[in-house]
């Protein structure tokens, strides 16, 4: 019995040690009186960990801000009536903002009591713009803050992947920037559907223009005839790079550069084909 008690005590100690307290007290949060946490409090935070905000007297919504804008990787205006806490999982861009600007807890009339971060998800992809667990049931909508895409060079990406635990493809999904005309980017009829994710091709979509005059990206799902499921990640999919560059008709303006064929032999007057120049594959 003593051994069992000792084991349980050690397990409890392990759980506690994995959590880092950021702030504790009572702060009446309104839109005019946010709770501000300095950046140094997140010095040891890591991608994939979850930030937990605890509160009481919740009546409406909460938002997480940083540098006076929505914190990248967070949901827009989370309704928290009758709730006691929210979990937010750290993405790469979120971590950068927290470490530089800190955190601001904003919302409508609730009392913040504690903030901490700790164990969350392992192996979060570096191109993840949102991660967490969002329950998709009947026409549920995840609203991701537009700041999650700040600094993105869309020409580097070919798709957006919406990952879930659905393990099926027969559900409805709508990817939207706004309600109404012109707001839909894709749905289950235009996206690539797999048991683990739905993928929106960016071919023909100008994402800079699509996000220009809006404040969020929305993902709406309906479970249809199957079970409800968790939505888990939104990941940008990079274009493949082959390492093959183009060689102009005049192969090089630098006469000191030497052109080799794939067998490692020098070539004086290369025709059409694949060559090696300065250690790079060059296509002529």
Model-derived segments and spans:
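Residue-level detector of functionally pivotal "anchor" positions at catalytic/ligand-binding pockets or at interdomain
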Residues: 239-263
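C-terminal tail/sorting-segment detector
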Residues: 2-3, 274-284
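Sec-dependent N-terminal signal peptides
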Residues: 4-13
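Extracellular ligand-binding interfaces
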Residues: 20-97, 102, 106-238
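Residue-level recognition of short loop/turn positions
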Residues: 125-127, 263, 278
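Sec/Tat signal peptide C-region and signal peptidase I cleavage site
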Residues: 13-20
């Amino acid at each position: 019995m003593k051994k069992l008690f000792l084991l349980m005590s050690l397990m409890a100690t392990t759980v506690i040690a994995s959590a880092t307290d950021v702030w504790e007290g009572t702060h009446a949060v309104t839109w005019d009186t946010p709770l501000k946490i300095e950046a140094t409090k997140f010095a040891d935070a890591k991608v994939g960990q979850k930030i937990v905000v605890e509160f009481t007297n919740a009546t409406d919504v909460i938002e997480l801000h940083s540098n006076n804008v929505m914190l990248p990787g967070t949901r827009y205006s989370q309704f928290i009536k009758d709730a006691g806490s929210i979990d937010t999982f750290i993405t790469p861009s979120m971590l950068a903002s927290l470490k530089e600007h800190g955190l601001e807890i904003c919302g409508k009339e609730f009392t913040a009591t504690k903030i901490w971060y700790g164990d969350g998800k392992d192996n979060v992809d570096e191109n993840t713009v949102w991660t967490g667990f969002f329950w998709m049931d009947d026409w549920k909508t995840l609203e991701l803050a537009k700041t999650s895409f700040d600094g993105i060079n869309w020409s580097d990406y070919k798709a957006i992947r919406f990952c879930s635990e659905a393990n099926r493809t027969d559900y409805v999904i709508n990817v939207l920037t706004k309600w109404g005309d012109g707001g839909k980017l894709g749905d289950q009829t235009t996206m690539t559907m797999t048991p683990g994710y739905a993928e929106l091709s960016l071919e023909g979509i100008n994402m800079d223009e699509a996000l220009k005059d809006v404040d969020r990206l929305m993902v709406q799902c309906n479970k249809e005839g199957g079970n409800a499921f968790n939505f888990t990640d939104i990941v940008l999919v990079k274009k493949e790079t082959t390492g093959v560059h183009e060689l102009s008709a005049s192969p090089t303006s630098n006469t000191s550069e030497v052109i080799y064929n794939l067998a490692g032999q020098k070539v004086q007057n290369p025709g059409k084909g694949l060559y090696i120049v300065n250690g790079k594959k060059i296509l002529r």
